[in-house]
């Protein structure tokens, strides 16, 4: 590939946006906790591989800016000493298991080579982790400071904002708390936001403006059904009436990656997600390496490819990488054709925005990071039609856009709210409504409990701690992850327990704040359990 870079002859833009989010799961009361493995798997399979890819682009002097949304709960977990220590233990256990597998598969060359592949991958991840001091947030921050990526935020606990619209101060608290957390992580204000589940309701812009956020992303129909209808469809953003830019998801680039029937990840040459040695091998053999010693689970070592509906065949790494290369070329060709068909129809170069969950790449789709790497390299070196751009840079170049009010929408099934509001999770919302009203009442009651420049009394300091913890518990209860899990049925008991635990803790704090005393020992225990947002501002509910 001949060396090239982006230049003025480009006919259009492509914006790649990856959304990295996991619910806040941290259980210091247990030595091992199954749901903490959600983070450990994503670090090993997605977040570190993405950082390794970005480091290779830096090494090769590739200017391929992408946008990454890092949610506040994810950043909190990635910065938490307890979870970081547990991740190191988990990673060392994976390396030990890979070494055992090398010995076990000694007489079978095909399986032995795969065992060595995993050993090499895991040791490389450990080396990267150690080289960055176990601080992945700082590694992303450095790339942003160098201008190689743009990091955006999302709502504080990934709450579905339209379902909080009856109590707007909760929307405000979700957005401003996220802004504050971003400042603590990255030393600046976020310019863009990933609205959780791309869920939009008119009025959210007021709080985005207060947080100095300039743009957000919607699903395709959120833009296409805007009023008035957008002249350029999703191929240019619109400004909401208060000047916040809304970018629409490009349907074609989404379909080619996400679609169960047409999407690339379903190719039979790719690694099968579900066939894991944690389920296939003798339980006593894999037990020391499982997320929970009481039950089988994923280890990350998987020897089979998707194959088809019948018996699975052994994974062939070279064939999978060939598929990734073919798909990267096809994806690029499709984007080039798309841009060329649109050239001249707009008053500026057309833009295709492709937002994806980051965890699709590497975790769910094992070869997904290689696909991104190959696509970026082909785009950078082999064509002169498309320029990779961030939405923030697009707005700098094209500051004038049509004004329109987007349609209420999400990127969930059927495009609206039913994934998060249905007969499996509707019980949550009346309780949230009451808690939100009580939080606002507390904020109003204690509005004079603020710093006056004098040393606060012990009683005032204790009340401030209780108010902050009440804010944390309400924010955690509002997470969209819990109703999503309840609807999907993947870990419903855990999701149900989390909602109830946070609401009960909130009720306890509310009752103490409206009575004559606060149980400091209990408060301290709750603070240690749910330690997200150390500087949570309860006054946002006023």
Question: Whereabouts are the PLM-identified features?
Answer:
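Active-site and substrate-binding clefts of carbohydrate-active enzymes
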Residues: 9-63, 70-112, 228-542
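Hydrophobic, small-residue-rich alpha-helical packing segments that form membrane-like cores
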Residues: 199, 204-213, 229
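His/Asp/Glu-enriched short active-site or ligand-binding loop at hydrolase and phosphoryl-transfer sites
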Residues: 160, 213-226, 389-390
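Acidic (Asp/Glu)-rich catalytic clusters
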Residues: 9-10, 55-63, 135-152, 183-186, ...
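Short, solvent-exposed turn/loop segments enriched in Gly/Ser/Thr/Pro and often Arg
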Residues: 69-74, 155, 192-201, 221, ...
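Conserved short loop/turn motifs at secondary-structure junctions
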Residues: 189-200, 357-361, 491
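CE4/NodB-like, metal-dependent polysaccharide N-deacetylase domain
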Residues: 170-195, 334-355
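Glycine-rich phosphate-binding "P-loop"
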Residues: 155-177
């Amino acid at each position: 590939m001949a060396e090239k870079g982006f230049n003025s002859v480009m006919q259009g833009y492509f914006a790649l946006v990856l959304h990295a989010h996991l619910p806040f799961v941290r259980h210091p009361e247990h030595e091992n906790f199954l749901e903490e493995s959600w983070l450990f798997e994503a670090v090993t399979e997605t977040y570190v591989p993405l950082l390794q890819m970005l480091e290779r682009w830096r090494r090769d002097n590739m200017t391929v800016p992408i946008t990454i949304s890092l949610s506040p709960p994810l950043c909190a977990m990635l910065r938490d000493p307890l979870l970081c220590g547990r991740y190191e233990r988990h990673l060392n256990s994976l390396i030990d298991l890979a070494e055992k597998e090398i010995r076990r598969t000694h007489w079978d060359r095909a399986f032995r080579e795969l065992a060595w592949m995993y050993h090499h991958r895991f040791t490389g991840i450990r080396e990267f982790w150690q080289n960055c001091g176990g601080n992945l947030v700082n590694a992303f921050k450095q790339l942003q400071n160098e201008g190689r990526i743009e990091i955006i935020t999302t709502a504080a606990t990934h709450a579905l904002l339209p379902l909080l619209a009856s109590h707007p101060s909760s929307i405000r608290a979700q957005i401003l708390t996220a802004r504050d957390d971003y400042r603590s992580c990255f030393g600046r204000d976020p310019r863009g936001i990933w609205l959780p589940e791309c869920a939009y309701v008119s009025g959210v812009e007021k709080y985005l403006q207060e947080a100095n956020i300039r743009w957000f992303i919607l699903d395709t129909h959120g833009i296409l059904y805007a009023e008035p209808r957008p002249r350029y469809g999703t191929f240019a953003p619109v400004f909401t009436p208060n000047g916040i830019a809304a970018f629409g998801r490009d349907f074609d680039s989404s379909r080619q990656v996400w679609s169960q029937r047409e999407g690339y990840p379903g190719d039979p040459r790719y690694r099968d997600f579900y066939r894991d040695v944690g389920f296939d091998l003798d339980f006593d053999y894999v037990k020391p390496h499982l997320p929970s010693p009481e039950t089988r689970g994923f280890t990350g070592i998987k020897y089979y490819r998707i194959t088809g509906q019948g018996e699975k065949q052994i994974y062939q790494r070279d064939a999978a990488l060939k598929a990734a290369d073919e798909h990267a070329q096809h994806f690029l060709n499709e984007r080039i054709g798309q841009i060329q068909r649109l050239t001249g129809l707009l008053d500026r170069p057309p833009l295709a925005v492709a937002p994806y969950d980051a965890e699709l790449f590497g975790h769910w789709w094992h070869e997904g990071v290689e696909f991104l790497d190959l696509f970026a390299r082909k785009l950078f070196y082999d064509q002169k039609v498309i320029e990779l751009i961030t939405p923030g840079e697009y707005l700098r170049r094209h500051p004038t856009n049509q004004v329109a009010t987007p349609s209420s929408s999400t990127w969930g099934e059927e495009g609206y709210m039913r994934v998060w509001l249905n007969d499996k999770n509707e019980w949550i919302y009346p309780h949230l409504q009451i808690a939100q009203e009580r939080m606002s009442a507390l904020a109003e009651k204690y509005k004079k409990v603020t710093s006056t420049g004098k040393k606060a009394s012990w009683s005032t300091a204790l009340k401030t701690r209780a108010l902050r913890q009440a804010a944390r518990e309400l924010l955690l209860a509002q997470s969209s992850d819990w109703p999503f899990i309840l609807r999907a049925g993947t870990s419903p008991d855990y999701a149900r327990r989390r909602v109830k635990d946070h609401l009960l803790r909130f009720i306890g704090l509310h009752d103490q704040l409206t009575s004559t005393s606060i149980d400091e020992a209990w408060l301290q225990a709750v603070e240690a359990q749910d330690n997200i947002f150390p500087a949570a501002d309860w006054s946002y509910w006023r």
